[in-house]
């Protein structure tokens, strides 16, 4: 019996299902994973903003305008990061006949590492924001310094997230 291409089709579909079942940065799930990463960054940044809103409210009511201004600046930086992440280029749509080259494993590892680093930076920002609230509540330490460190961390995260665009831009042209 001679096999036809239609006979092989179920086997090819099975192999595709196995490969797509891996929920890493595979072709079928790149955009979905990109969306999940961006949602996590936005969620964590929103937590930082919430902590800073609490600091701002308590310090403004208490008459400590210097700390309130620093918290307001941090809230603005959080808003900028949330906006940047929300409007950032989405990861790697790839049409068969487009001018975009396919990502290599090296490209994918670079993107995964970059995404992980951004999430770690935002998590450090959340920890700093929480520490600033704790510092105010216990009257220990310098809350203005901690708020300014939080602002610096979010600002650095914003710049680091912008580098992600360059990683994705490297995939835009075939070489």
Model-derived features with residue positions:
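Leu/Val/Ala/Ile-rich N-terminal alpha-helices, chiefly Sec-type signal peptides and the beginnings
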Residues: 1-60
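Low-complexity, intrinsically disordered regions enriched in charged/polar residues
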Residues: 2, 6-9, 13, 31, ...
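Residue-identity detector for glycine
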Residues: 3, 14, 21-24, 28, ...
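Arginine residue identity/basic-tract feature
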Residues: 13, 30, 38, 43, ...
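Charged linear interaction tracts used for macromolecular binding and regulation
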Residues: 51-146
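Preference for long, well-ordered alpha-helical segments
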Residues: 135-175
């Amino acid at each position: 019996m001679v096999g036809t291409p239609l006979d092989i089709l179920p086997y090819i579909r099975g192999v595709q299902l196995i490969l797509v079942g891996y929920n890493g940065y595979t072709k079928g799930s790149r955009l979905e994973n990109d969306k999940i990463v961006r949602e996590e960054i936005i969620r964590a940044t929103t937590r930082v903003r919430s902590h800073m809103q609490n600091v701002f409210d308590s310090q403004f009511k208490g008459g400590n305008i210097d700390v309130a201004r620093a918290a307001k600046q941090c809230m603005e930086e959080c808003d900028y990061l949330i906006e940047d992440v929300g409007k950032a280029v989405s990861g790697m749509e790839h049409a068969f006949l487009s001018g975009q080259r396919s990502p290599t494993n090296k490209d994918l590892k670079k993107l995964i590492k970059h995404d992980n680093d951004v999430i770690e930076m935002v998590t450090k920002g959340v920890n700093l924001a929480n520490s600033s609230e704790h510092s105010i509540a216990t009257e220990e330490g310098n809350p203005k310094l901690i708020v300014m460190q939080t602002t610096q961390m979010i600002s650095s995260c914003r710049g680091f997230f912008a580098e992600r665009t360059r990683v994705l831009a490297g995939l835009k042209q075939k070489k």
